Amino acid sequence: MTEPLKPRIDFDGPLEVEQNPKFRAQQTFDENQAQNFAPATLDEAQEEEGQVEAVMDAALRPKRSLWRKMVMGGLALFGASVVGQGIQWTMNAWQTQDWVALGGCAAGALIIGAGVGSVVTEWRRLWRLRQRAHERDEARDLLHSHGTGKGRAFCEKLAQQAGIDQSHPALQRWYASIHETQNDREVVSLYAHLVQPVLDAQARREISRSAAESTLMIAVSPLALVDMAFIAWRNLRLINRIATLYGIELGYYSRLRLFKLVLLNIAFAGASELVREVGMDWMSQDLAARLSTRAAQGIGAGLLTVRLGIKAMELCRPLPWIDDDKPRLGDFRRQLIGQVKETLQKGKTPSEK
């Protein structure tokens, strides 16, 4: 028994011919081009955070200008003139036995001494803040170093500056994990994964609490002036707490340098339309429609406070960010939204629910 033949199948289009992949031509560099070659580096942090992050970096970066040097030189000459004139008055009062003038000179000397002591203290605190940047550079070099002998002493100095006791469990785990055969990169990396997260967790809690208080305060307060004053106070307090956690004592000039960033935060908090319309790109349209203008403004101000806290952490932290351990804005976003929604639900009457 024979099977019937199958009918012929006609194809409309021609068969596709396989094409060999085309490769780019080989590029070669001569010796001159190889010597002048430099890899392009991209600042990933600024690309991720945007233009606002660049403005914050510029506000935190120390600036040196000719006008500043001239002002400092003038103040130094004025101070020397005041001291010289005071010495001359004291000598004249002693020779003429003018005890009233002599007492005034003594009081002035005490005031000047207190002022000089305050300036020296502020300069030391400002130097300590700048020294932290050098410590980060040193830590970055150690994280790329294969030498030995420097990593352990460096980490022990950081622990002492942060006020971590030798009996702390995290520090004890670090001591148990290191041994003599490890290089500086491995020792510092272990410190960054075992000890540093303890301080980072405390700083995160401070940021979360401050941002939540700012969010709820602005969401329920009807006075814009009170909101701005509250944000300024909370942000300054947040900076001080984060600096204290990382072993840095801020002085007047150190706070003054960071106050530019606080003013930037206040300016964004005052722009309710910008926060409500532009700042809702990370929220769904349904949630944005349910939130009131004050609640949206409160969330925006809270997120900006979080950004301020993250920048303060980056400035005061002795180690650079590694292995994506930098806190992100999205880590605090859901918590702020949940707190605002919970507050709005509590404020509604049973009939409204």
From Swiss-Prot:
Periplasmic side: 1-69, 121-212
Cellular compartment(s): Cell inner membrane
Primary residence: membrane
Transmembrane segment boundaries: 70-90, 100-120, 213-233
Protein biosynthesis as UniProt keyword: no
GO CC field: plasma membrane
Membrane topology reported for the UniProt record: Multi-pass membrane protein
Stretches in topological domain Cytoplasmic: 91-99, 234-353
Key words of the record: Cell inner membrane, Cell membrane, Membrane, Transmembrane, Transmembrane helix
Keyword Plastid found: no
NCBIfam families linked: hyp_HI0043
Record-stated family: Belongs to the UPF0283 family.
Protein name: UPF0283 membrane protein YcjF
Organism, scientific name: Shigella flexneri
Lineage: Bacteria, Pseudomonadati, Pseudomonadota, Gammaproteobacteria, Enterobacterales
Gene name linked to the record: ycjF
